[in-house]
């Protein structure tokens, strides 16, 4: 099985920290924050082994850029896949019910 390098951008790392911190501090649910962190890390690990199982999103603004979404809990890891160089680039970690296409139009 082919292994892929996973690069997490600063924006994605900041998103993940903000999500975990919000759940822990604002919602006062440390256990849920720990579960979400574990799910996030599991998702990153799955991208190392089989990123192709997540298809390119059909949402406007994402499809054109080849952005794929890997769900975990109520969130999505937005990433691109470079098969030729066996590289996954994690762009953002966002609430799944947010207007994802609008967030990527701004970038």
Residue ranges and their predicted role:
Residues 39-49:
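Compact soluble domain cores
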Residues 72-76, 80-107:
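Enriched for short, Lys/Arg-rich terminal
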Residues 1, 51, 95, 99:
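Residue-level signal for pocket-adjacent positions within structured domains
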Residues 50-84:
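Basic/aromatic recognition patch in beta-strand/loop cores that engages polyanionic ligands
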Residues 1-39:
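Arg/Lys-rich, positively charged N-terminal/basic patches that mediate binding to nucleic acids
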């Amino acid at each position: 099985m082919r292994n892929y390098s996973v690069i997490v951008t600063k924006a994605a790392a900041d998103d993940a920290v903000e999500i975990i911190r919000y759940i822990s501090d604002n919602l006062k649910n440390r256990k849920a924050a720990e579960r979400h962190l574990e799910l996030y890390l599991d998702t990153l690990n799955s991208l190392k082994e089989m990123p192709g199982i997540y298809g390119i999103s059909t949402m406007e603004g994402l499809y054109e850029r080849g952005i794929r979404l890997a769900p975990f809990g109520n969130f999505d890891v937005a990433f691109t896949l470079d098969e030729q160089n066996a590289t996954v680039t994690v762009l953002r970690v966002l609430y799944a019910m947010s207007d994802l296409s609008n967030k990527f139009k701004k970038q």
